[in-house]
Amino acid sequence: MAEPRTLVLLRHGNSDWNQKNLFTGWVDVELSEQGVAEGQRAGELLAESGILPDVLHTSVLIRAIDTANIALKRAGRSWIPVQRTWRLNERHYGALQGKDKAQTLAEYGPEQFATWRRSFDVPPPPIADDDEYSQSADPRYADLGDTLPRTECLKDVIERMLPYWESDIQPDLASGRTVLVTAHGNSLRALVKHLDGISDADIAELNIPTGIPLVYRLDEDFRPIVPGGEYLDPEAAAAGAAAVAAQGSKK
């Protein structure tokens, strides 16, 4: 039997807008002090467990890039090769980007709020190109042209993420490399849904905490040997996931 492939998923550390309880999406916000500490702890967990990444795949958003850099430095792996892609970006929250989650919940009610936040195939209203939180003039997306997302549901995230998983991440895993993917709550939910075969309905209940490595051992068909993977700090992961689930109720 072939050796299991090792995939490490890491959601970026807590950001300034996580702390302010704002919809972030593709808005490029910095890590908070808590997020920096989470990145450092993630690196310590990787080093302590002996799970040392050989290659990094990350989004083009600074909160993921910085989290990965902080974690890899703490783990002594700053030198590994890196690939960045918009396909690992957070879900685009459309016109909700920059809006307060608690205010949105109060204004539109729990049913509409839950639909926009957790529905598999219903996106929020699209963002206008002249909105201050639009990415229409962002040079990192210049090659996307008219295909630049202006809103997304989780289904859209899966459709733009999976081609990259198959073309770039799977080959690294197949070569025997330990792969670190540092990304976002929804792009990682999209990947976990694919890996674990989670249904469209059940994925709404999955929450991924910030800054805690989630390790998957995959067989030769890239299927999890342990469904759901294993967090390197299970207690902190459970508390973090509960905090993510409660977003919107927080003032």
From Swiss-Prot:
The record marks 184 as: Transition state stabilizer. Substrate binds at residues 11-18, 24-25, 63, 90-93, 101, 117-118, 185-186. It comes from the Bacteria. GO terms for molecular function: phosphoglycerate mutase activity. The active site is at 12 (tele-phosphohistidine intermediate), 90 (proton donor/acceptor). One of its GO terms (biological process) is glycolytic process. The keyword Isomerase applies. Its EC number is 5.4.2.11. Pathway: Carbohydrate degradation; glycolysis; pyruvate from D-glyceraldehyde 3-phosphate: step 3/5. It catalyses: (2R)-2-phosphoglycerate = (2R)-3-phosphoglycerate. Keywords: Gluconeogenesis, Glycolysis, Isomerase. Belongs to the phosphoglycerate mutase family. BPG-dependent PGAM subfamily. Catalyzes the interconversion of 2-phosphoglycerate and 3-phosphoglycerate. NCBIfam families: pgm_1, PRK14115.1, PRK14120.1. This is 2,3-bisphosphoglycerate-dependent phosphoglycerate mutase.
